[in-house]
Amino acid sequence: MTVTVRFAPSPTGYIHIGNTRTALSNWLYASKNNGKFILRYDDTDVERSKDEYAQAIAVDLDWLGVRPDRVEYQSKRFDIYAKAVEKLKTAGLLYACYETADELERRRKLRLARRWPPVYGREALKLTDAEKAALEAEGRKPHWRFLLPNFESDPFATQRTEVHWDDLVRGPQTVDLASMSDPILVREDGTYLYTLPSVVDDIDMGVTHIIRGDDHVTNTGVQISIFKALGATPPVFGHHNLLTTISGEGLSKRTGALSVGSLREAGYEPMAVASLAILIGTSESVTAAPDMAALAEHFDLASISKSSAKFDPSELDALNRSLLHEMPFEKAKPRLEALGICGAKAESFWLAVHGNLDRFSDVSHWWQVVSGDLPEAPDLSGEDRDFVRHAFDLLPPEPWNGQTWKSWTEAVKSATGRKGKNLFMPLRLALTGQAHGPELADLLVLVGLERTKSRRP
């Protein structure tokens, strides 16, 4: 058996880091088991689904390093779903209902008042052909419900009916079908809700493992019933915990702030995003994996907590810094060249500055510092200005090396009596225009004598 998984986003918005957790969990599981990963767009809602969102999802996944083995669009598979609908109708497992939303709400409230479970009472099963024809003559169109197998012979005499599965994350799970309403699979306009196309596609595409958020746990009992009704063996299920904001709110496509695209535009490394999306809320320590192979070594569905995990942007910042601080020059080189940072001093420049980067794009600023003019003149007080002028008069001749900074500052200390912060801070401001940054012993060599002299206030 070839392990086959799928990620099935709805292209009705941009995916966020919570969706990323699901996509990466599936992709890593397939990778570790020499399996296949299917990207399947749940675009049956033709009004809300947009091609621009589908394209954005593909770009986001590619940026994260997730490359599907197969791409499918549910909107192109309606004929297959129609055949499944007819099969269920023929078996007497899909029945027409005509209630409006208001009528269903009144019935729900009535059941609650009688202290009955607020589930659909299957009233539509009692309709005669004449009553159905009369309702349709009024202009009503039916929606179609799946008849859950929670009874023996009388569908109005429901009884506890347990569905069991061994969840890859949560262990043994049980849901009671008697506590649920028969799910609507087909809307009045003939379009399909999520449940039916999902099951039909999983069967048709040979999906063996379904890994998704734990907000789908209850759905699983229904879907297992539909798998069996269509004559298929249900796949293995795994439900990971969900990510929330730091305040505990659920993530949503509508918020946008934590969309993968916005994180990319903010300059985060893809492996910082991937590492946090996978390792947060697990028993594993949250560290920055340098690549997908390393992340796969830490990926274990059994290590996932059953409680939701809070996404803290500060953790993402820390992981991003860690990746940049540990990134070897050979890995950074193509990206540096794309920014015009090349030549004989490119490697020594990277080694000098990468330990101070928050974002990779910060290198452009430091390259300007060592290779061009300062973005703006440093703000030095009169006393510090005089001190820096004196210090620059003591600059040693070239050639310079890693010891030049030490020998120069020792000479300045002897000549001026300044030491510590009072000595180093004015020199740093004059040389770089910044109060903080990479080691000046490394930067000074890169700036060079002539450019350093040009920065004499």
From Swiss-Prot:
GO molecular function (one): glutamate-tRNA ligase activity
Domain of life from the UniProt record: Bacteria
Alphabetical list of CDD domains matching this protein: GluRS_core
GO cellular component: cytoplasm
Keywords assigned: Aminoacyl-tRNA synthetase, ATP-binding, Cytoplasm, Ligase, Nucleotide-binding, Protein biosynthesis
Reaction(s) the record says it catalyses: tRNA(Glu) + L-glutamate + ATP = L-glutamyl-tRNA(Glu) + AMP + diphosphate
Motif range ('HIGH' region): 9-19
Positions of short motif 'KMSKS' region: 250-254
Subcellular location: Cytoplasm
Role noted for this protein: Catalyzes the attachment of glutamate to tRNA(Glu) in a two-step reaction: glutamate is first activated by ATP to form Glu-AMP and then transferred to the acceptor end of tRNA(Glu).
Subunit comment: Monomer.
NCBIfam families in the record: gltX_bact
The protein, known as: Glutamate--tRNA ligase 2
Recorded name of the encoding gene: gltX2
